[in-house]
């Protein structure tokens, strides 16, 4: 017979660190080529002019310029980089 009570184990006591997603450069901000503009899961924001789309749906600048967010249609946003002149 046990003289001490057995220790119960916990199962739901874990949490993962946040993934640091979101907008990294906002509208009217200057960016250099290669700067990350948005980190996202899926295409919440769609790529416009002078931006690239990474395999993890990261949107990044292809040229130096100014970030511009636009409403593509009712449900879609797009982000472009306007060349700095």
From Swiss-Prot:
What's a BP term from Gene Ontology annotated to this protein? translation
Q: Which residues does the annotated region (Disordered) include?
A: 1-23
Into which family does the record put it?
Answer: Belongs to the bacterial ribosomal protein bL27 family.
| HAMAP family on file | Ribosomal_bL27
Instruction: Give UniProt keywords alphabetically.
Output: Ribonucleoprotein, Ribosomal protein
Phylogenetic classification of the source organism: Bacteria, Pseudomonadati, Campylobacterota, Epsilonproteobacteria, Campylobacterales
Q: Which organism is it from?
A: Helicobacter hepaticus (strain ATCC 51449 / 3B1)
GO-annotated cellular components: cytosolic large ribosomal subunit
Q: Which GO terms describe its molecular function?
A: structural constituent of ribosome
Which PANTHER family does UniProt cross-reference here? LARGE RIBOSOMAL SUBUNIT PROTEIN BL27M, RIBOSOMAL PROTEIN L27
Q: What is this protein called?
A: Large ribosomal subunit protein bL27
This protein's source sits in the domain of life called Bacteria
């Amino acid at each position: 017979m046990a003289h001490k009570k057995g220790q119960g184990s916990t199962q739901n006591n874990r949490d993962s660190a946040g993934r640091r997603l979101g907008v990294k450069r906002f509208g009217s901000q200057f960016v250099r080529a290669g700067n990350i503009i948005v980190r996202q899961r899926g295409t919440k924001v769609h790529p416009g002019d002078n931006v690239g789309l990474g395999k993890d749906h990261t949107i990044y600048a292809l040229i130096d310029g100014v970030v511009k967010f636009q409403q593509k249609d009712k449900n879609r946003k797009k982000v472009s980089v306007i060349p700095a002149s």
